A protein has these predicted regions:
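Bacterial N-terminal signal peptides that target proteins for export
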Residues: 1-7
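C-terminal motif of bacterial Sec signal peptides marking the signal peptidase cleavage site
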Residues: 16-17
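Short, glycine-/small- and polar/acidic-enriched structural segments
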Residues: 22-172, 183, 190-196, 210-213, ...
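Sec-exported extracytoplasmic/periplasmic mature domains
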Residues: 62, 89, 108, 161, ...
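Periplasmic-binding protein-like
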Residues: 118-127, 204-235, 239-246, 281-286
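Proline/Glycine/Serine-rich low-complexity intrinsically disordered segments
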Residues: 130-137, 161, 167-170, 181, ...
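Secondary-structure end/capping motifs
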Residues: 232-293
């Protein structure tokens, strides 16, 4: 019994120490979260899709082809263009690879954007082989997957302009490019607009190309940034470093070809070797800030 007070005191001291340790951990955890949030806010965040037009961003990031003392480059991967644009509108990213029709839509809604340059993105309207559709005129009473207020919406208008169909064409908003392709594979959609490499996969499965944005003379891919960034010297330095890395990646892709980076394409586009082997030639133009043009 003589040792009982000593034992109780030891337990109290131990519990007190544990309590202090827990409080310290909570404090450090909050400090760490605050530090990470600050770093995230200061970084240059770029919204990208699992598509070939975004390859210069992926490649520049993988190989660190930019001045890391000037920019902490972070990629925000989304499967839907509309999600990239929402992030750009909400300023949770600074740069996005998008299309001119999405840019027009955002601009109309008060989003200030800076166009940095075009991409070589193109879209093909591909009909499910089971739908027996070979021309736009045969799309009556068929479902076409697209995204509202985007290149695919605009291209649908253009494809149907002056065309008589037997019944209305049903536009179905399927924003996720990977889900869109899966719906074609599973015969859940009659037709859809796809860019690369998803378009190549669709062609590989013998689905029918009925329209092509290149034949329509429409070049709609673009890289944009928030216009407000040009008022911030640090952000301008970040953008300058990003542009240098992006253009270096373009040069490498144009020189070696996108198939040279098959492992990266498979990883970021969620595709396979068979699709990559069948990819057509794809070119990558440089981008620039306005003062650099």
């Amino acid at each position: 019994m003589k040792h009982k007070p000593i034992f109780l005191l030891a337990v109290i001291v131990l519990l007190s120490a544990c309590g202090q340790s827990y409080e310290e951990k909570v404090r450090l955890s909050r400090a760490e979260r605050a530090r990470l949030a600050q770093e995230e806010a200061a970084a240059l965040k770029v919204a990208v899709l699992p598509t070939l037009d975004c390859m210069p961003v992926y490649l520049a990031k993988q190989n660190h082809w930019y001045d890391s003392t000037q920019v902490d480059l972070r990629l925000k991967v989304r499967n839907a263009q509309i999600d990239c644009d929402t992030a750009l509108k909400g300023k949770s990213v600074e740069v996005a690879v998008t299309d001119l029709k999405r840019v027009e839509h955002m601009t109309k809604h008060g989003v200030g954007l800076l166009t940095m340059g075009p991409t070589d993105a193109y879209w093909q309207l591909i009909a499910n082989r089971t739908a027996r559709v070979k021309t736009a005129a045969q799309l009556g009473d068929k479902m076409v997957a697209m995204t509202r207020y985007s290149a695919t919406d605009y291209l649908t208008d253009k494809a149907l302009d002056g065309v008589k169909t037997s019944a209305p064409v049903f536009r179905v908003q399927i924003n996720d490019v990977l889900i869109r392709l899966d719906m074609l594979k599973n015969n859940e959609m009659d037709a859809m607009w796809l860019t690369e490499p998803q378009a190549t996969t669709a062609r590989m499965f013998k689905h029918t190309v009925i329209e092509d944005s290149r034949k329509m003379k429409e070049h709609l891919g673009v890289v944009v940034a928030g216009a407000h960034l040009m008022k911030d010297k640090k952000r301008v330095k970040q953008l300058t470093a990003f542009v240098e890395g992006y253009n270096r990646a373009c040069d490498s892709l144009n020189h070696y070809g996108v198939k040279h980076y098959a492992d990266l394409v498979k990883a970021v586009c969620h595709t396979d070797d068979k699709t990559i082997d069948r990819l057509p030639k794809y070119s990558y133009p440089h981008i620039a800030l306005p003062k650099q043009r």
